[in-house]
């Protein structure tokens, strides 16, 4: 993929978690005939990004991402929490003007929503731009490069929300459908989503 340049964002797909509440690799779980991970990749409008990087502990997911043309990084210490995934991906795309941080367990997230987040950030490049529904923030979130040092300083299972809480004045919300922001942290959550599909 291309090198990052002015107002060109990278996209980091965070797919390295242990899914302890799910009981197994939840990203292999099926929804509407596809794995959660495949649906996450399908929601990425790759043309909007200078680079897409997938961080995972699972070789099969890294292989799928590589076949899709995306960069991959093995997280060999997922027990260190989401902060390690954030750090690995952020350092790999440190030359980008911003990075969209995307979880991989939102099967109803639409590529159009991701496009609108990137468009809004390009109009307001100093803002943290996040998907939201009726004012309630969700994922994904796009952070300008000025926040990379704080993101790289995160520890254990602390994610980008702790950075956002310190910079609420810089937050720009982009409206999304409520169901798009629903993440499948448990098998029960996935079954609920299937029942409402």
Task: Label the predicted regions.
Residues 2-7, 155-197:
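Conserved alpha/beta core of the MobA/IspD/sugar-nucleotide pyrophosphorylase nucleotidyltransferase superfamily
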Residues 3-137, 169-177:
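Nucleotide and nucleotide-moiety/phosphate-recognizing core
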Residues 21, 60-64, 150, 183, ...:
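Phosphate- and divalent-cation-binding pockets in alpha/beta enzyme and binding domains
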Residues 30, 108, 142, 183-184:
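Short aromatic/basic micro-patch
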Residues 58-59, 145-146, 187-188:
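Short loop segments at secondary-structure junctions
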Residues 107-108, 147-149, 179-180:
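Short histidine/acidic/glycine/proline-rich micro-motifs that form metal-
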Residues 114, 147-151, 189-190:
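A generic structural signal for short hydrophobic patches within well-formed alpha-helices
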Residues 137, 141-167:
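Short, glycine-/small-residue-rich phosphate/pyrophosphate-handling segment
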């Amino acid at each position: 993929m291309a090198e990052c340049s002015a107002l060109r964002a990278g996209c980091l797909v965070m797919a390295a978690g242990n899914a302890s509440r799910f009981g197994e690799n939840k990203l292999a779980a099926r929804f509407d005939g596809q794995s959660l991970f495949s649906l996450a990749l399908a929601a990425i409008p790759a043309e909007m990004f200078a680079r897409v990087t997938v961080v995972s502990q699972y070789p099969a997911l890294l292989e799928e991402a590589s076949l899709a043309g995306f960069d991959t990084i093995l997280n060999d210490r997922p027990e260190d929490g989401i902060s390690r995934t954030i750090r690995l991906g952020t350092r790999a795309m440190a030359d980008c003007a911003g990075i969209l941080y995307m979880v991989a367990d939102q099967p109803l997230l639409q590529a159009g929503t991701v496009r609108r987040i990137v468009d809004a950030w390009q109009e307001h490049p100093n803002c943290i731009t996040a998907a939201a529904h009726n004012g309630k923030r969700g994922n994904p979130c796009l952070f300008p490069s000025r926040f990379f040092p704080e993101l790289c300083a995160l520890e254990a299972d602390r994610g980008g929300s702790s950075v956002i809480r310190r910079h609420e004045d810089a937050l720009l919300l982009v409206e999304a459908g409520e169901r798009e922001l629903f993440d499948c942290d448990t098998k029960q959550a996935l079954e609920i989503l299937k029942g409402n599909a």
